[in-house]
């Protein structure tokens, strides 16, 4: 069964933080990448033009850095860009530095992705979500991670059906 890669030397996050890889996107039932869909939804929430341009630049840089294996993995969940999601088996979380103002609240942004163990160098984007700070944000984040895990499982099933 496909699972999150746990590299013998580098552990979790080996591709995004050490070896590099290439991106594919998990897609919805209409074939639209979740990453594209969620970026569009975020744009529709009246994010300011300046924040939008900064977000695009940061996401593009994050994706390039992961492809090159230049992100920082942190299993303490406090300092690095990438960590393993605690509540899911197959999901990694990349924290964006930028926060955006939505409806008068600063929101933290997270890219959820996986590094499937059975496809060499693959970085699979699962979701780009935003959350509040504090405990309510942690509850939102748990929901986002659970959704990303379901998307990973769906991606695995779709591959098997082909």
List the predicted regions and their residue ranges.
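Active-site beta-strand-loop-beta-strand hairpin of nuclease catalytic cores
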Residues: 109, 116-126
């Amino acid at each position: 069964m496909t699972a999150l890669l746990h590299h013998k030397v580098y552990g979790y996050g080996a591709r995004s933080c050490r070896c590099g890889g290439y991106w594919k996107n998990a897609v919805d039932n209409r074939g639209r990448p979740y990453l594209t869909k969620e970026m569009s939804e975020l744009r529709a929430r009246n994010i300011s033009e300046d924040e939008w341009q900064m977000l695009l630049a940061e996401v593009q840089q994050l994706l390039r850095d992961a492809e090159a294996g230049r992100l920082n993995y942190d299993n303490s969940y406090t300092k690095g860009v990438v960590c393993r999601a605690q509540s899911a088996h197959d999901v990694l979380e990349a924290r964006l530095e930028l926060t955006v103002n939505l409806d008068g609240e600063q929101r933290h942004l997270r890219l959820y992705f996986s590094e499937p163990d059975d496809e060499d160098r693959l970085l699979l984007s699962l979701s780009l979500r935003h959350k509040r700070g504090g405990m309510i944000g942690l509850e939102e984040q748990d929901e986002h991670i659970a959704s990303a895990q379901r998307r990973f499982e769906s991606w695995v099933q779709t591959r098997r059906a082909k």
